[in-house]
């Protein structure tokens, strides 16, 4: 999965997919009442990027639905996975469950079209703080209450705070999650970060006994870092430059080892070599 980073304006969906992304990451900010409000990152953000692009969250969801609904004039068949980077740092811990409920209602209405031929992309809810694990239950309970438990098949989870792998496992246990887990690791492109935790996550994924199904590394903008990440065995790389990742995947060392994921590749099933 080549994951376009910080895709917060509707026009950027096409821009990143056309550069080679089959997945995007979108920031979600919340208002004081835990309503998802804008797709907005703000300052500071990655070096070389504008931090200030935004849409109203519901408008973005409608644009995303168009891009991921077969038959729509804006349909992009390659776009199969969306990571919502939930900026829950602005919320009190006791609002996490409420944020999950409201997120579920927004997605159900504006993205899944109330279960009636909505967008088809898989969704990852990425949460920066382990203490906000109740967001997951708020989300899953709401989809069930609204009569659409089947949509949970399209939803996965990520804790993005670079916490110890054992602590992340405990948070999932509390949230009642087993499966559909992506584990992120990374840092802004302005700084360097080693791959030791990525390797730990890959080992957990491949052990058959861990909680992780997929691993992604962010933010990867250079060819050398891309090669290191692919060599470490990641499933996804998040990038500001999808074309750089695509180029490296076409290099002789990789072109017979890795390929771009398609809609038929489940993002929840650990790939067996």
Curated annotation (Swiss-Prot):
Q: What is its main location?
A: secreted
Pfam families hit by this protein: GDPD_2 (PF13653)
Reported EC number(s) for this entry are 4.6.1.-
Keywords in alphabetical order: Cytolysis, Dermonecrotic toxin, Disulfide bond, Hemolysis, Lipid degradation, Lipid metabolism, Lyase, Magnesium, Metal-binding, Secreted, Toxin
The record lists the organism as Loxosceles hirsuta (Recluse spider)
S-S pairs: 45-51, 47-190
Swiss-Prot/TrEMBL GO biological process terms: killing of cells of another organism; lipid catabolic process
Q: Which family does it belong to?
A: Belongs to the arthropod phospholipase D family. Class II subfamily.
Question: What cofactors does this protein use?
Answer: Mg(2+)
Cellular compartment(s) = Secreted
Q: What does this protein do?
A: Dermonecrotic toxins cleave the phosphodiester linkage between the phosphate and headgroup of certain phospholipids (sphingolipid and lysolipid substrates), forming an alcohol (often choline) and a cyclic phosphate. This toxin acts on sphingomyelin (SM). It may also act on ceramide phosphoethanolamine (CPE), lysophosphatidylcholine (LPC) and lysophosphatidylethanolamine (LPE), but not on lysophosphatidylserine (LPS), and lysophosphatidylglycerol (LPG). It acts by transphosphatidylation, releasing exclusively cyclic phosphate products as second products.
Cofactor remark from the record: Binds 1 Mg(2+) ion per subunit.
Q: Which GO terms describe its cellular component?
A: extracellular region
Which molecular function term from Gene Ontology is one that the record holds? toxin activity
> Know the name of this protein?
Dermonecrotic toxin LhSicTox-alphaIA2bvi
The catalytic residues are 5, 41 (nucleophile)
């Amino acid at each position: 999965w080549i994951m376009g980073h910080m895709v917060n304006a509707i026009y950027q969906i096409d821009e990143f997919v056309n550069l080679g992304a089959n997945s995007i990451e979108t920031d979600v900010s919340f208002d004081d009442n835990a309503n998802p409000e804008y797709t907005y990152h703000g300052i500071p953000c990655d070096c070389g990027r504008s931090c200030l692009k935004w849409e109203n969250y519901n408008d973005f969801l409608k644009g995303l639905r168009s891009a991921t609904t077969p038959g729509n004039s804006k349909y992009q068949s390659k776009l199969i996975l969306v990571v919502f980077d939930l900026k829950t740092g602005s919320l009190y811990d006791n609002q996490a469950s409420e944020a999950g409920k409201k997120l579920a209602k927004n997605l159900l209405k504006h993205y899944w079209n109330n279960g009636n031929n909505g967008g088809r992309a898989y969704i990852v809810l990425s949460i920066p703080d382990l203490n906000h694990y109740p967001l997951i239950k708020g989300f899953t309970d709401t989809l069930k209450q609204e009569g659409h438990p089947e949509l949970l098949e399209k939803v996965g989870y990520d804790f993005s705070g670079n916490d110890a792998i054992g602590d992340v496992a405990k948070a999932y246990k509390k949230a009642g999650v087993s499966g559909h887990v992506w584990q992120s690791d990374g840092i802004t492109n302005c700084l360097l970060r080693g791959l030791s935790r990525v390797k730990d996550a890959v080992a957990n994924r491949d052990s058959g006994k861990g909680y992780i199904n997929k691993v992604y590394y962010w933010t990867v903008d250079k060819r050398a870092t891309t090669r290191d990440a692919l060599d470490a065995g990641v499933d996804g790389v998040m990038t500001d430059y999808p074309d750089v990742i695509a180029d490296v995947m076409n290099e002789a060392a990789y072109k017979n080892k890795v390929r771009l994921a398609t809609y038929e590749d489940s993002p929840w099933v650990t790939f067996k070599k």
